[in-house]
């Protein structure tokens, strides 16, 4: 059986390192390419028996599927490279923290490409999304909704993609859509009726 060649974009990130370990457990997968930020000290060195590089074109050409857990700018650069390539490499991306303009550009670049995007791919979170949707349908008209989330101290985006996904699940279940509200500093303002308020904590290795 032909093995699926897997390229990892961001192999030295928390998720990248975890994926490297998991690939060993699947005989049908073959680690084929590792691409990291050109300024990272790992570039030019071996990781899991493969020389780490910073060439997006090389990553695309050496992979059947690219797994991407980087930052928005890097993900957009990857998609731009894919659009130039004749090789129809698929991408699984869990990158979060897109601004509205970046998200618009991301969606435009995705057209015609094989892209799977999720802000959180765990089974538990996807079950939770369905529970939140159903709960919101029952109680949200009478309730104030807040989302409190905590992540490790290396997490860049606030609120997290998972928190935003749960807010989307709330809005899938309600009749009157709620607006996301970010309280980044202390204010004397009262919360509004139809809003979802986020609070975020970053610390340790959660």
Each PLM stretch: what is its role?
Residues 66-67:
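N-terminal Rossmann-like NAD(P) cofactor-binding module of classical short-chain dehydrogenase/reductase
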Residues 63:
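An anion/phosphate-binding loop that grips the pyrophosphate of nucleotide cofactors and donors
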Residues 2-4, 89:
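Nucleotide donor/acceptor-binding cores
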Residues 2, 9-57, 140-206:
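C-terminal substrate-binding/catalytic lobe of Rossmann-fold NAD(P)-dependent oxidoreductases
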